[in-house]
Amino acid sequence: MMRSRRIVVAIAIVAACLIGLGLASDFLVDWTWFFSLGFLGVFWTIIGAKIALFAAVFVATAIAIWANGALAFRFAGSRAYPRPVSMPWQSLGSEQLPAVIERLVPYLLRRRLVAGISVVVAAFVAFGWTANWNLALNYIDQVPYGQSDPLFGNDFSFYLFSLPAFVALKGWMLFVLALGALLAALIYWACGEIAFDARRRFVSAAAIAQGSVLLGFFFAIEAWSFCLDRYLLLYGNNGVVVGASYTDIHVELPILMALVALCCAASIASFANARLRSVKLPLALLALVLGTSFVLAPVATGCFSASM
């Protein structure tokens, strides 16, 4: 066991050194280039923005993922440690790999390991997000343009600086929410709180409650996403009209507002289901929102465009 741990630690150290060398190489190349141009101030501004963005995203992502895992451990029952459960693929005749996974799960899913996973995943997410340093600086340092769009009355600076940052933030929120939900579902499954096999289909009340809360946050983020999509109509280009067309204003915009209202109602219902703890209600809400946004809305827009 000690030898295995030493091997893992050695691999981690080597990987960290390789990553560090790569970052140091990029740092020196950029520093040399900016120094040759006489713009070291710009270089340090970019570095500071990347560090601040990394720290903010890292902390927020780690807390969000860890909180989901910690809550799942707390509400997954009275068992101090997860136990293996029967797996649906064992009836497929290939039991070697699933058997190994089934034996490893109780030992892998520990509170400390979940915290470590949260930190590692958050580090990767934050590192990827440092590429958005320009969006962060543009949002922070924006100034009014002095002219407004005729449809929503927003200053042009909103579309140049705020909207791109909001869209990126929305994507991060959905991604982190999905990671947290995946970790919580894995813990509930390993603890026997979720089971789908030939003998039984079972989801515990605790899993339903936490899943409903996460789904409520998902619908809330989607409501905000549809609000942002209203402004993206001004970026439209159908080959004839650049900007919001007649169909966008009279069909797409009302549909987006209806989707915002639908997602808000679905979010409230999902949060309420944390006490009701019904399995069918979240599935019905998810099917309703996805069906409306991906099927009914495009069909309605297409029918209106064809009738003109």
Predicted regions and their residues:
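Contiguous transmembrane helix-bundle modules in multi-pass membrane proteins
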Residues: M1-T32, F39-N154, L163, V167-M308
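Active-site cores that bind ATP or allylic diphosphates and position pyrophosphate for catalysis
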Residues: L160
